[in-house]
Swiss-Prot record:
Top-level taxon in the UniProt lineage: Bacteria
Protein name as it appears in the record: Uncharacterized protein RP566
Localization terms from the record: Cell membrane
Principal location listed in the UniProt entry: membrane
Amino acid sequence: MLKIKQEIYKNSLQVILKFFFALLCFCIILFPLLSYKINIQSRIFPAMEIIFIYYFMSLYSLNIFSIFFLGLLIDQISGMPIGTDSLVFVSANIIYKLSSKYFLAKNYLINFVVFCFYCLFILNFKYLLVTIKNLEVEGYLIIFFQSLTTIFSYNIIRLILDSPMDYFKKYAK
């Protein structure tokens, strides 16, 4: 009977911790919109989807189907043509998995350098796909600034996500 109560307690604690982590991720995305009236679609706002997908892909394993469906969801939210973000994220994931044989991505410095190239690849490939489809393009300088804000904000987001994730790993299992 005591083991059953402990198991129920652990399962409920795990659900609560996962909920708080999802709420934390949501607040990270929502905070700039409420505080500074900066929309997620704004070009000075960092590409949070790239940060979150890379974070969970590199430190924890995301499979290719979840990345594909996340890309479809991001397409629906951002108004991009269906499949654009999915193609970009799946391509970047394949390149990351093939190249990760040659380096250890758990090291912080290597992880950051790889993220810089990952971010540049995704933003440039997305820009290329948008210009091929003759959609509205505002210029390459905006993509450059968005990549800079994304790269600079990766460290902050990783600091925010790492300490709760360590806590969740310790108590959720």
